[in-house]
């Protein structure tokens, strides 16, 4: 007798259910997507005990006839595709015809459905077996109640996480699907209590204000872009806002919530230099592409998609994000350049000291005393335009700038580092960074491997205005440096050069020039701990205004923090 046998239908359904129904949220996903495909304008999702004991989805969609409802409980029974060609042009969320059969095979299910013109139907199913079929006198739409999930597959229950985890997954999914369809009203009920109801008025911004706290609302940039058959729109976080160590993305392709590395990498590259490595921005992104150019049939849960034109999608998303961030920074500087108040008189040092004594503020407030000049450009000092007032410097690193209704706190090192980075990058693009011969050459010790590396990249480093010569078997003598470092002491020059050696020692040399520019910018910028005079602070702020530079240092740290009068009044409960 042969060893190969056909598995019984009940066992086949349970195996198939393992791919489609991984956990309670899988049930919610499949049922809600069916409701959307049925044209529902209102969907109510209820669950209890993390979805293990109860999941119910009610909609006002087109409903099913008795014949269709019974047929839909069979695998591969669907109204959404009919031919192989349909598989490559899918416009619905569901299409395989597996969901209801898979869910019914591992639970106790009650299905009620009614169309506009025909009588309704009630079907009771246990473990994939139909137990009862009757008439149902309800409203147009569908009601599906799933209870005792995995009651007949106890091994599957063991792999479920805690009730709190399963609950959070369901809440997160309903939020995500509600964002994708703001024109549909969603109600979520957890353990008998309503969590939220969305209005279903199509207003996405209003929906975001309902689902997220005010911190999220105030930190988003809206954008939209169209190129040929591609369209992208949505919201991304402002540089320095809402960043996290894990991805916090809401990606939708043709209104389908997906995970996709192409989109994720394009967004991260768009934020490059505006966010720290290893961190993620907040994003809600709707990408529309021709249905024929996206394959949604690459994963059992349909969460992953594959693009026919991967490179074009990547470049389109990257450009869109970069342009949105550039535009936001332009707006920021335009708003800063046009305050609505007249310039205030600066207080003298003695007046500020008196104010400190009266208020007894616990701040290291050092107005306008200098230990190191910001730039030789201070000698060409031009006062700030009217409407701005530099309050002073705190903690030897932060400049406080005031306008009529806002306060700006500026990290002097990070801001100057960005300025130097942009200047050096521009000089390198023009093909010339000015160098200068130093009076006392700096001798540093190097290993044999480092000497080989320096010889290999000698031409590149000379483009950055460094020049050196051998000084024995294990030493080199630096004789020329960029003009920016003329007045640096030997230890500072050695530290910079060692950092550059570290840059060229890394295996990934694809972005070597950028790494070297970042190192040079960091070392040439005014340091944290340098006390600045007023003219130096004003010169730094003027350079920020004039260059319209990104609002982060080259490594992605924000250098400016805007606090509105409204924010302060809200904090002190004045509004």
Curated annotation (Swiss-Prot):
GO terms for cellular component: mismatch repair complex. InterPro entries: DNA_mismatch_repair_CS, DNA_mismatch_repair_MutL, DNA_mismatch_S5_2-like, HATPase_C_sf, MutL/Mlh/PMS, MutL/Mlh/Pms-like, MutL_C, MutL_C_dimsub. GO terms for biological process: mismatch repair. One of its GO terms (molecular function) is mismatched DNA binding. The keyword Cytoplasm does not apply. Keywords: DNA damage, DNA repair. The keyword Ion transport does not apply. CDD domains: HATPase_MutL-MLH-PMS-like, MutL_Trans. It comes from the Bacteria. Belongs to the DNA mismatch repair MutL/HexB family. This protein is involved in the repair of mismatches in DNA. It is required for dam-dependent methyl-directed DNA mismatch repair. May act as a 'molecular matchmaker', a protein that promotes the formation of a stable complex between two or more DNA-binding proteins in an ATP-dependent manner without itself being part of a final effector complex. This is DNA mismatch repair protein MutL. It comes from Dictyoglomus thermophilum (strain ATCC 35947 / DSM 3960 / H-6-12).
């Amino acid at each position: 007798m042969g060893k190969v046998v056909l598995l019984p239908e009940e066992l086949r359904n349970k195996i198939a259910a393992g791919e489609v129904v991984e956990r309670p949220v899988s049930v919610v996903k499949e049922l809600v997507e069916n409701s959307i495909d049925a044209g529902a304008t209102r969907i109510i999702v209820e669950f209890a005990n993390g979805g293990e004991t109860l999941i119910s989805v009610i909609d006002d969609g087109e409903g099913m006839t008795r014949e269709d409802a019974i047929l839909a409980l069979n695998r591969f029974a669907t109204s959404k595709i009919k031919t192989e060609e349909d598989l490559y042009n899918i416009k619905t969320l569901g299409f395989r015809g597996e969901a209801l059969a898979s869910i019914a095979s591992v639970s106790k299910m009650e299905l009620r459905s009614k169309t506009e013109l025909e009588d309704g139907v009630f079907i009771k199913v246990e473990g994939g077996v139909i137990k009862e079929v009757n008439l149902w006198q309800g409203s147009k739409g569908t009601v599906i109640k799933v209870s005792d999930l995995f009651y007949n597959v106890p091994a599957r229950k063991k792999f479920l996480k805690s009730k709190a985890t399963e609950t959070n997954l369901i809440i997160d999914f309903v939020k995500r699907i509600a964002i994708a369809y703001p024109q549909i009203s969603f109600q979520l009920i957890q353990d008998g209590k309503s969590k939220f109801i969305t209005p279903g008025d199509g207003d996405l911004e209003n929906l975001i204000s309902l689902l997220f706290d005010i911190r999220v609302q105030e930190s988003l940039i809206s954008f939209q872009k169209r190129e040929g058959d591609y369209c992208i729109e949505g919201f991304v976080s402002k540089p320095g806002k809402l960043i996290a160590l894990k991805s916090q993305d809401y990606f939708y392709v043709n209104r389908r919530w997906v995970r996709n590395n192409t989109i994720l990498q394009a967004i991260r590259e768009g934020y490059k230099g505006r966010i720290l490595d290893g961190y993620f921005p907040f994003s809600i992104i709707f990408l529309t592409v021709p249905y024929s150019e996206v394959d949604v049939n690459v994963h059992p849960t349909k969460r992953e998609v594959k693009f026919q034109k991967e490179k074009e999608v990547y470049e389109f998303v990257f450009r869109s994000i970069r342009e949105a961030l550039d535009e936001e920074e332009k707006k920021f500087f335009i708003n800063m350049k046009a305050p609505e108040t007249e310039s205030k008189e600066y207080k003298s040092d003695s007046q500020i000291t008196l104010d400190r004594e009266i208020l007894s503020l616990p701040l290291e407030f050092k107005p306008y005393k200098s230990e190191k000049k910001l730039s030789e450009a201070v000698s060409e000092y031009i006062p700030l335009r009217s409407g701005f007032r530099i309050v002073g410097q705190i903690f030897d690193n932060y400049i406080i700038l005031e306008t009529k209704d806002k306060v700006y706190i500026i990290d002097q090192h990070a801001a100057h580092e960005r300025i130097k980075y942009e200047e050096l990058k521009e000089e390198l693009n023009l093909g010339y960074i000015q160098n200068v011969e130093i009076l006392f050459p700096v001798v540093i010790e190097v290993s044999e491997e480092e000497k080989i590396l320096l010889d290999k990249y000698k031409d590149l480093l000379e483009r950055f205005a460094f020049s050196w010569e051998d000084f024995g078997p294990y030493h080199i003598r630096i004789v020329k440096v960029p003009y920016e470092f003329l007045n640096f002491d030997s230890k500072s020059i050695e530290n910079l050069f060692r950092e550059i050696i570290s840059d060229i020692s890394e295996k990934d040399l694809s972005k070597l020039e950028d790494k070297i520019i970042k190192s040079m910018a960091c070392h040439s910028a005014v340091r944290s701990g340098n006390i600045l005079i007023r003219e130096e602070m004003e010169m730094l702020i003027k350079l920020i205004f004039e260059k319209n530079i990104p609002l982060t240092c080259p490594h992605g740290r924000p250098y400016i923090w805007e606090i509105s009068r409204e924010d302060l009044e809200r904090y002190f409960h004045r509004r």
